[in-house]
């Protein structure tokens, strides 16, 4: 297992300078204010802003500490964020988190210098440990067709991003919180649920992995699970994936501590990161 990721949530873009009318007359002794620069390298300090465009449509505004209305991504950059994560749904209601919406947000992020993580859910809505629903358009597929659908969807979205000029894609998640796999199906010959068909899960992961490398060869591919504090569950999942020829570059761990356990959860997660590496 080559790398580790503890729920890093990422963003990316190339800095955009805007020059407005500045006086250059001899009697103007004012010194133009320098554009602030931001270090967007190093340890990934990220945020998932997948809901941003929908929130903006609903009139939501964001304010800095001085009470000044500020565009959300600019505000995040000012506060030290250097990476953005954007989730992708296959055919979502209203188009939110669909391909076009993701491209729009990714382009905005790149213009601000953020690094990007693209998070494929392979579903029309949320994919999480209790819900890995097959997209409506993929219902009834065979395992081979499902594998091809994963590859095609992944390549389609990433190619569209690249064609738009988005170059700062540093990480790609193939699946979201896949503690027991993804693309669950009542047909055990097709399901990607690990507890029922680990070989299919590995095949679907590999289809996504290979598609990522076709478009962004240098991007790190993440297999993402929750319960970062649970070493037994983590080793079970990644061992199943490894035993079935699964490929990944980075282990992505989510952690959801509560008030009464945050310290032990954090310590366990850090220990698990070292163990899994």
Q: How should each PLM-predicted stretch be described?
A:
Residues 56, 60-67, 90-100, 179-183, ...:
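Acidic-and-aromatic substrate-binding clefts and catalytic sites of carbohydrate-active enzymes
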Residues 15-38:
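Bacterial Sec-dependent N-terminal signal peptides
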Residues 73-197, 201-228:
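Substrate-binding cleft and catalytic face of glycoside hydrolase catalytic domains
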Residues 35-72:
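Boundary/entry segment of secreted carbohydrate-active catalytic domains
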Residues 1-10:
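Bacterial N-terminal signal peptides that target proteins for export
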Residues 46-50, 119, 172-176, 251-253:
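Non-cysteine beta-strand/loop elements that form the S-adenosyl-L-methionine
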Residues 70-73, 77, 218-220, 232-277:
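Glycoside hydrolase catalytic-domain groove-lining segments
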Residues 44, 168-169, 248:
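Core-facing hydrophobic residues within beta-strands of well-ordered domains
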């Amino acid at each position: 297992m080559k790398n580790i990721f503890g729920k890093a949530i990422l963003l990316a873009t190339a800095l955009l300078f805007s020059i407005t009318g500045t006086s250059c007359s001899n009697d103007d002794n004012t010194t133009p204010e320098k554009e602030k620069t931001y270090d967007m390298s190093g340890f990934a300090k990220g945020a998932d802003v997948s809901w941003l465009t929908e929130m903006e449509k609903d009139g939501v505004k964001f304010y800095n500490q001085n009470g000044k209305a500020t565009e959300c991504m600019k505000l995040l950059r000012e506060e030290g964020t250097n990476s953005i994560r954007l989730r992708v749904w296959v055919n979502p209601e209203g188009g939110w988190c669909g391909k076009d919406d993701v491209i729009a947000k990714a382009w905005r992020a790149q213009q601000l210098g953020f690094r990007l993580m693209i998070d494929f859910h392979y579903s029309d809505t949320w994919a999480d440990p209790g819900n890995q629903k097959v997209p409506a358009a993929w219902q009834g597929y065979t395992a081979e067709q499902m594998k091809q659908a994963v590859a095609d969807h992944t390549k389609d979205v990433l190619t569209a991003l690249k064609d738009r000029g988005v170059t700062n894609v540093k990480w790609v998640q193939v699946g979201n919180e896949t503690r027991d796999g993804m693309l669950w199906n009542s047909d055990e010959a097709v399901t990607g649920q690990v507890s029922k068909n680990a070989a299919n899960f590995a095949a679907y992961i590999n289809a996504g992995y290979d598609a990522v490398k076709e478009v962004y060869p240098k991007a790190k591919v993440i297999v993402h699970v929750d319960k970062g504090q649970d070493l037994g569950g983590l080793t079970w999942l990644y061992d199943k994936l490894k035993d079935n020829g699964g490929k990944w570059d980075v282990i992505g761990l989510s952690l959801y501590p509560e008030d009464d356990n945050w310290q032990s959860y954090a310590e366990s997660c850090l220990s698990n990161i070292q163990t899994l590496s």
